Amino acid sequence: MKDLLKFLKAQTKTEEFDSIKIGLASPDMIRSWSFGEVKKPETINYRTFKPERDGLFCARIFGPVKDYECLCGKYKRLKHRGVICEKCGVEVTQTKVRRERMGHIELASPTAHIWFLKSLPSRIGLLLDMTLRDIERVLYFESYVVIEPGMTNLERSQMLSEEQYLDALEEWGDEFDAKMGAEAILALLRAIDLEGEVRTMREELDQTNSETKRKKTTKRLKLMEAFLQSGNKPEWMIMTVLPVLPPDLRPLVPLDGGRFATSDLNDLYRRVINRNNRLKRLLDLAAPDIIVRNEKRMLQESVDALLDNGRRGRAITGSNKRPLKSLADMIKGKQGRFRQNLLGKRVDYSGRSVITVGPTLRLHQCGLPKKMALELFKPFIYGKLESRGLATTIKAAKKMVEREEAVVWDILDEVIREHPVLLNRAPTLHRLGIQAFEPTLIEGKAIQLHPLVCAAYNADFDGDQMAVHVPLTLEAQLEARALMMSTNNILSPASGEPIIVPSQDVVLGLYYMTRARINAKGEGMVLSGPKEAEKVYRAGLADLHARVKVRITEYLRQEDGSLRAHTEMKNTTVGRAILSLILPKGMEYALIDEPKVLTAAEQADLDANPQNWIKSVSNKALGKKLISRLLNTCYRKQGLKDTVIFADQLMYTGFHYAALSGASVGIDDMVIPDAKKDIIAAAEAEVAEIQDQFLSGLVTAGERYNKVIDIWASANERVSKAMMENLSKERNVNSLGEEEEQASFNSIFMMADSGARGSAAQIRQLAGMRGLMAKPDGSIIETPIVANFREGLNVLQYFISTHGARKGLADTALKTANSGYLTRRLVDVAQDMVITEDDCGTTEGLWMTPLIEGGDVVEPLRERVLGRVVADDVIKPGTEDEVLVARNTLLDEQLCDLLERNSVDRVKVRSAITCETDFGNCAHCYGRDLARGHLVNKGEAVGVIAAQSIGEPGTQLTMRTFHIGGAASRAAAESSIQVKNTGSIKLQNAKFVHNSDDKLVITSRSTELTIMDEMGRTKESHKLPYGSVLEVKDGQAVNAGETVANWDPHTHPIITEVAGRLHFEHMIDGVTITRQTDELTGLSSIVVLDVNERPSAGKEMRPTVKLVDLNGKDVMIPGTDVAAQYFLPGKAIVNLEDGANVGVGDAVARIPQESGGTKDITGGLPRVADLFEARQPKEPAILAEISGTISFGKETKGKRRLVITPTDGGDVYEEMIPKWRNLNVFEGEKVEKGEVLADGPESAHDILRLRGISPVANYIANEVQDVYRLQGVKINDKHIEVIVRQMLRKCEILSAGDTDLIEGEQVEVARVKIANRKLVAEGKTPATFRHILMGITKASLSTESFISAASFQETTRVLTEAAVGGKRDELRGLKENVIVGRLIPAGTGFAYHHGRINQRAAAARAVGVPQVTADEAQQNLADLLNAAGSFDEE
């Protein structure tokens, strides 16, 4: 019998499926699921609590209420399994079948399924080519629709009102057929001939020219084809049978006092059954039409409410005035089935408690309270007690544990040993929010946490709580130990920098012990080694900071990896020598004590007086940055184990010496500079002066405000500078009797200087002045707070302060929610991005160059290419073919050094965006796994890691939109370029002419001036505006600080390209121009009138300046046959007279430029969200659609017609541009495709369309990085690239070729590529397409997997679309697999999935049998059960 049961269990296994298909259910299908028809609205008998027969909880239909017991009690026990009771008709089986057996309701009149009717675009409407309004009028019995026109002049699906219908009846009798209600729609849907329609529509598409018609036809065509391919029939969108959910999924629970708690679904079903039964009765009675009609409409409404309450009309409410929860509400939203139960499950074996510091723990340990451990590990303890024979049964073991006998604790110790537990702190923003530790038992009730992992958890000990989870199975323990142990997560997956970095006390302790103090006790000693230094210090003979000579033995790593000892005397301090004791072998001493770089004079002094060696001791102490670098170097050189031990040792040492340092903060530590009074008095005087100027009308209110704020901002700077100088330096006499300067030992200064806590800005508020405050709207209050916290604030100052503080709190709350939502969208778009193969073999890639803004290198090349794979051989600069790095090599630290030594400044690297893998990404295109430091493994979920890396720092980004102005970002209008580096000038995309002084005048808009060093590396780059005058030539050498270019920032010149005499055309005084004379200088100038200021005679005229030679003939622009003529736009100013002579490079006219004004720059989180959502900016830059020559056509009201004539003689391109846009181009100028014509924020869509994939990737990556860099957050570019790849997943079909795609359709690129490969192999025409950029929300919703999309947002819409198209979900991504309850196809599950797929394929090949379908399995099971029943009888 047991074997049979096992066999049965094996039979019902349905895990073996490869994909899930969703479709429309036909009435027959619904009947086949059902175990009987629900005929009555009754639920259960309120006295006996037994379900009513034929009701919503009927036991005959849905199964027994108690295990193996029929309702009337005739058959009980297991032996009657499978018997159907003659009396009550209930099958004797397990009660859990009530969770899976469905019923059905036969509807007396067909009803439309609201999802296919109302979910836009209405599927029924599309198929019938009727508007939703019309269909609703038919469905809700307001008008008739013609179904069969017969021999009349009516059309099929024509609407008829009541009167029209009666007239038609009189005229034609029963020649035609017209109905109302769902029956009519059902008949229309049945009559559709899909194949015929598809044929006619494809022909229509080929013939039509109108865009709107094309779009509409394409939509219909896609829908029809979906129906054809999926095997759905259109009439199934109208329901004639309604399925009934199994009763245990809509429970009814008796409460005490004779009341019941029930699921809303029961109410909705009751309503449907009541109306349906009433309708049946009315139809039997042949009631009047109007009554039947009303009943049918009510039935339709109740079915609507059951499926999706509130979708149409007012939602049906329950007794508590709340809308009832319908079937659709059950699955959608945060509380729906997908997000609440399938994606987020609660787990057993977990506990939570407050955390405290565990300064004595090792990095892989955590302290677990005994009580907690005992509870969590109970099953293991029971097992151990039994196997040891200490307890005979589980029950006895349980008693022992409850009594907490002594032996139980010993066993708990054994059980816990080497059994890791997971610690998690909410919110888990990235994968380091859950890590594994080995528990050690502690007294008390709080969990102890190692201080170094706090950064990863973002935890502090002010009452944070953490949860503990126990991995149960051996595999889970193994994964926890090998992958999640805190010692295996030293590097951050976001940037590849160490995340196990000491902070606060530890940093302060290490900083304190590595400081040097002048004339400390024991200065000038000579010691035999670090051990002796420690002895001397412990004995109190020398101070920790004393400058001494110590014999240090370093172990240096050789080329072959072996260690070589090297001993020498070092001038250092006692503390640094002691610290060197914990330095791992193989790391040089210079890492903790950088030798001081001596000037020539100091070196000479030292040679002359050797006793002055004290002065050569470096005065640099270990700060936070240096410690981080120390750990990073250790990881790269020494590997994981040494780093972990070293980090722990650093922590213990740091805590120890921080305690000994006795650093504390007293009020006297906040030293207020003496100069403060004078500085503030001077600022007040300046402000008073400006106020006077304002009152006498010399400056405007706006200028006054800005100047006042400038004055106070600079005063604040001066005060804080004075204060820091005062705080940070002190002078002392050394042992040689000379005075030396040293860094101060002021506690506050040490904390800030070491990076332990606080910053210069905070010290400024304590001891300088608080400075300017902002109002909640972001504008700056012009009276600053001149007091600091040491002096104390008065009431007014305190009140001003609260403004900013309150805004900060409100911002933070909003920010957290926004940031979480951004992370959720990112995870959703990238969740199926997994490394699926080793190398896709592509030669494509992105060009990487150092990021340079003005004169500063923001990000050097090495940081951008470290950990990437080279796409092409890197050639040594200056040679033709000497290969430095071969293609497909992973660039590690050594290779990056090699590139730097050879001054390479562009490298083509492989990128996720250019990867050719169909699904997922390949390891070579991704490069290094940042958290592990080697090439990424197959199965790594790089998409989720990317999303977490971008989302996790989201809460640190600001929410503000920055106003330019105030002290936020004051940049005076630039008017010249001063170079910061020495090097040679190089001009890029320059067009220029030489003027009369033989200086270059720039005549193009995209000119860049770069400074190259002698190795040919770019040091800085500047944009040169049109009309700037260069002081230098291309290729000339310049020195740092030289001014190389000048221009007038307030006007925009028009530059001549040839010499000649001026000739004015259409320049008529009072019509197109007006003359103005400057009162001060007496010079007159001509100002061109704007079109709308001219009289009607001058509207069409175009004022022009022509250049003519002495004979009055037009002068041509060299190398072209275009006459040199310059059209003058409105407001242009001409300072020359008609007939004046001009040279090359002179300005014939100037156009005044309004200064930028206060445009808001969107910053922070909103900016990142805008970029990833690929939103169109408000006024985007206008880019040239084709390459060619610019000219202007006829103007219209408010718009200019811009014409580009292509150089290769193709079609002319025209665009209407609003007049107020500042154009960057003039008539006759040549532009390249994708060049900026009118300034503004560039739109990512335009960049992709006109410049291609690589530029759009660079644009998004750089813009996102700008936001993060401002906050000092480091994120690797490749994470952003992974997201961009997902945004570029879709393409638009341009021509279909021999595929069955439709032009203009949006399809996954991978699909098209696969189809094209097949076509090319068969020698047919492939489809052509162009990439499109989708925002992350849209991309998530349009993924191939409908399960993933439905669990993200807009569940109804996604499921409706998927059902109509009969979509199949291949379960490729992570989300789908979590939802169906499988291992995810990433990480350790990657191999499992591949094995499974291969196994199934092999099995199918071996047997050659088709897979068993679900129905067959069901049948087999039924046969077996019946057979089982017959065994028992014997």
Swiss-Prot record:
InterPro entries: DNA-dir_RpoC_beta_prime, DNA-dir_RpoC_beta_prime_bact, RNA_pol_asu, RNA_pol_N, RNA_pol_Rpb1_1, RNA_pol_Rpb1_3, RNA_pol_Rpb1_3_sf, RNA_pol_Rpb1_4
Keywords: DNA-directed RNA polymerase, Magnesium, Metal-binding, Nucleotidyltransferase, Transcription, Transferase, Zinc
Documented EC number(s): 2.7.7.6
Keyword Acetylation: no
Binding site for Zn(2+) 1: 70, 72, 85, 88
SMART domains on file: RPOLA_N (SM00663)
GO molecular function, one term: zinc ion binding
Cofactor: binding comment: Binds 1 Mg(2+) ion per subunit.
Cofactors named for this entry: Mg(2+); Zn(2+)
Claim: Transmembrane is one of the keywords in the record: no
Top-rank taxon, per record: Bacteria
Pfam families: RNA_pol_Rpb1_1, RNA_pol_Rpb1_2, RNA_pol_Rpb1_3, RNA_pol_Rpb1_4, RNA_pol_Rpb1_5
Gene3D superfamilies assigned to the protein according to its UniProt record, in alphabetical order: 1.10.132.30, 1.10.150.390, 1.10.1790.20, 1.10.40.90, 2.40.40.20, 2.40.50.100, RNA polymerase II, clamp domain, RNA polymerase Rpb1, domain 3
Catalytic reaction equation(s): RNA(n) + a ribonucleoside 5'-triphosphate = RNA(n+1) + diphosphate
PANTHER family in the record: DNA-DIRECTED RNA POLYMERASE, DNA-DIRECTED RNA POLYMERASE SUBUNIT BETA
Subunit structure: The RNAP catalytic core consists of 2 alpha, 1 beta, 1 beta' and 1 omega subunit. When a sigma factor is associated with the core the holoenzyme is formed, which can initiate transcription.
Purpose of the protein: DNA-dependent RNA polymerase catalyzes the transcription of DNA into RNA using the four ribonucleoside triphosphates as substrates.
Family of the protein in this entry: Belongs to the RNA polymerase beta' chain family.
Annotated protein name in UniProt: DNA-directed RNA polymerase subunit beta'
